[in-house]
Amino acid sequence: MTNIRKTHPLLKIVNNAFIDLPAPSNISSWWNFGSLLGICLVLQILTGLFLAMHYTADTTTAFSSVTHICRDVNYGWIIRYMHANGASMFFICLFMHVGRGLYYGSYTYMETWNIGVILLFATMATAFMGYVLPWGQMSFWGATVITNLLSAIPYIGTNLVEWIWGGFSVDKATLTRFFAFHFIFPFIIAALAMVHLLFLHETGSNNPTGISSDADKIPFHPYYTIKDILGALLLILVLMTLVLFSPDLLGDPDNYTPANPLNTPPHIKPEWYFLFAYAILRSIPNKLGGVLALVLSILVLVLMPLLHTSKQRSMMFRPISQCLFWILVADLLTLTWIGGQPVEHPYIIIGQLASIMYFLLILVLMPMASTIENNLLKW
């Protein structure tokens, strides 16, 4: 008799996705981040659910309710800090996952890649709305500054911003709707992630060489299940080290001051994982131009399959492209640093140069390098 896992309508899906799935025999630890992102999402949904049980989405009590969670709720402090730092781990895994995709040419799986870009946008939107909920100074002013960017849209901008605010400023209506959206979005992300996986399993995983691995497949279980468990343990180790030893390391001290519309903090800045985009936004003196650059900095990922001029899929055997890739990584780190600095000399010019470099590398230099490498292969 056939094993139940191969015949049962539900178990069959799990079996084909996580047990008997044919996987390339040579995928490295860079392929661990997909499962780690899944773990991060489940962790965020669970901790978020328990936080929502004690949180109140009202301007008068939101800040106090978060304090109450940390002081009076059983293990509330650890749930709160796991949720806050879990977001950081989520974005570290996201950036690594996208970086892996860029390096090894995984973007040639167009459907999987484009859903991934939508997932990235959805996760960024969720994290932004979540940051508003504690209703500290940085929550309030971050919400004000970022939502205000939509007013740069010609003709409908102002109406759009007031519609999102639910009034003429960030207030109770804004907080309530942000809480509602912050609660529902992770479930939308989970659904999209399943579609992401569905499309991936249509083609099978890419591998470091970028060459078809159909001739050499191994079952996902036990090989990659055990590998994913190791990755998960390392993720939890890093997360819990952060939570238990320095939970506020990545946060902003300003968010421990209750929101005050009459007092603007000296330096308004988002969480660290948005700083690179924030630096690109600030490097353009024009409001609409800045907003466009901000959106394009992520949307440029959609163009990656079109910008792929190389005859090889992966960068494994392309040293020039490798150099440019790591320069891009360094550039993104520079932008992240600049995003957290005040708007003054020399930071302004460094930010502008790094922003130009970012788009230049992706849109011009990397496709050029690929063409040069193609020609070098003819010799």
Swiss-Prot record:
BP-aspect Gene Ontology terms: mitochondrial electron transport, ubiquinol to cytochrome c
Domain of life: Eukaryota
Binding positions for a ubiquinone per the UniProt entry: H201
List of residues binding heme b b562: H83, H182
A Pfam family of this chain: Cytochrom_B_C
Intrachain disulfide bonds: none
Cofactor(s) annotated in UniProt: heme b
Subcellular location: Mitochondrion inner membrane
UniProt GO cellular component terms: mitochondrial inner membrane; respiratory chain complex III
Cofactor detail note: Binds 2 heme b groups non-covalently.
Membrane topology: Multi-pass membrane protein
Keywords: Electron transport, Heme, Iron, Membrane, Metal-binding, Mitochondrion, Mitochondrion inner membrane, Respiratory chain, Transmembrane, Transmembrane helix, Transport, Ubiquinone
Database matches in CDD domains: cytochrome_b_C, Cytochrome_b_N
UniProt GO MF annotations: metal ion binding; ubiquinol-cytochrome-c reductase activity
The family this protein is said to belong to: Belongs to the cytochrome b family.
Extra remark: Heme 1 (or BL or b562) is low-potential and absorbs at about 562 nm, and heme 2 (or BH or b566) is high-potential and absorbs at about 566 nm.
PANTHER family: CYTOCHROME B
Protein name per Swiss-Prot or TrEMBL: Cytochrome b
Organism: Cephalophorus rubidus (Ruwenzori duiker)
